[in-house]
Curated annotation (Swiss-Prot):
Substrate binds at R6, K7, S93, Q94, R95, Q160. One of its GO terms (molecular function) is FMN binding. Keywords: Cytoplasm, Flavoprotein, FMN, Isomerase, Isoprene biosynthesis, Magnesium, Metal-binding, NADP. Belongs to the IPP isomerase type 2 family. Its EC number is 5.3.3.2. Mg(2+) binds at E161. This is Isopentenyl-diphosphate delta-isomerase. NCBIfam families: IPP_isom_2. Homooctamer. Dimer of tetramers. It catalyses: isopentenyl diphosphate = dimethylallyl diphosphate. Its cofactor is FMN; NADPH; Mg(2+). SUPFAM superfamilies: FMN-linked oxidoreductases.
Length: 352
């Protein structure tokens, strides 16, 4: 199957309920209500910095798509919304545009429609493993130039690669290749997962290399489940996907994992479905959060701006009801953890 057909499959399957697996454990986090917040709702200030760049909220549009006509239209709409709301935007994996230059436009629409907000380029770890140093440097520069990126993300998707019919489960040497990416980019380097989470052990290995870690935790869109749905001609891949679609570290736990071993910028993603979930992520220790599936679905339904406005209103309300005037104050609000998250923190000896 061609890579362009695969990209469109991913769009439709990711926007469906079939792709939604498990819980990110945000129900395990209760922010304590402040009945006397001593602030007005109008005083709540969402502005913050994304890896040094000023943005209007600690929330961005996560990595989704690119490479097909449908993806190009979606990326244009996402970029327009990012520009309107003053929030960062990731693009989906740019590999397809590097091997098929005729589809570069499906990514270039992002810089055309969002010239003033931080944009994040995106390449996959398996491509790092297979490329030589010079070719990798060229890919990094091209990916950044394609969207005028402020930062570059390298996504870790080992579980997806194992079950994908066209998968490339090659990860040997990726850590050293990340150093090449960082040097070639001359931009902030984000290392992100895609739905299975990042542990404290991996976070520790990324210290000094990654400028940011995006946890990409379990409990939302499962690319393992998506690849299982695509694997109609491969019983083995379908069986593997069915077995491993529940594999991973729930997002709330992954935030605590990374926070315990990594002092850099921490981005939460994976199963965040409201501004309240995002507020909980920040209270747990994240500096920023992104959402993908709800925004993809909203874009396909023609209600993207309404969805973003609702997420921002939910986040602002959470801050008001906890007495947090700023994002920095939100990180300090009192909270209570449910038994699953509390047990995880204790067994893994985490700070959260």
């Amino acid at each position: 199957m061609g890579i362009d057909k695969r990209k469109d499959d991913h769009i439709y399957l990711a926007s469906s309920e079939l792709s939604q697996i498990g819980s990110a454990w945000f129900e395990e986090v209760v922010l304590i209500h402040n009945a006397l917040p001593e602030i007005d709702l109008s005083e709540v200030d969402l502005t913050t910095r994304f890896l040094g760049a000023p943005v209007k909220a600690p929330f961005g549009i996560g990595a989704m798509t690119g490479g097909t006509e449908l993806a190009g239209k979606i990326n244009a709409e996402l970029a327009k919304a990012a520009e309107e709301f003053g929030i960062p935007i990731y693009v989906g994996s740019q590999r397809i545009a590097l091997v098929k230059p005729e589809v570069k436009w499906t990514f270039e629409v992002v810089k055309q429609n969002a010239p003033h907000v931080p944009k994040v380029a995106n390449l996959g770890a398996p491509q790092l493993a297979e490329l030589g140093e010079r070719e990798l440097e060229e890919w990094v520069v091209q990916a950044i130039d394609m969207i005028d990126a402020y930062a570059i993300a390298i996504h870790l998707n080992a579980a997806q690669e194992v079950v994908q019919p066209e998968g490339e489960p090659r990860f040997k040497g990726v850590l050293e290749k990340l150093k090449i990416v960082k040097r070639a980019a001359g931009k902030p380097l984000i290392v992100k997962e895609t739905g299975n989470g990042i542990s404290k052990e991996v976070a520790a290995r990324l210290s000094g290399i990654a400028d940011a870690i995006d946890v990409g935790g379990f409990g939302g869109t499962s690319f393992v489940a998506i690849e299982g749905a695509r694997a109609k001609e491969s019983p083995l891949q379908k069986r593997l996907a069915e077995t491993y679609k529940w594999w991973g570290i729930p997002t709330a736990a992954s935030i605590c994992e990374v926070k315990s071993a990594y002092a850099g910028y921490l981005i939460a993603s994976g199963g965040i479905r409201s501004g309240l979930d995002g507020a909980k992520a920040i209270a747990l220790g994240a500096n920023f959060f992104t959402m993908s599936q709800p925004l993809l679905k909203a874009a396909l339904d023609g209600r993207l701006r309404e969805e973003i406005a609702m997420i921002i209103a939910e986040l602002k309300t959470a801050m008001f009801l906890t007495g947090a005037r700023t994002v920095q104050e939100l990180a300090l609000v009192p909270r209570v953890y449910g038994p699953r998250l509390r047990n995880w923190i204790e067994q893994r000896r985490l700070t959260c």
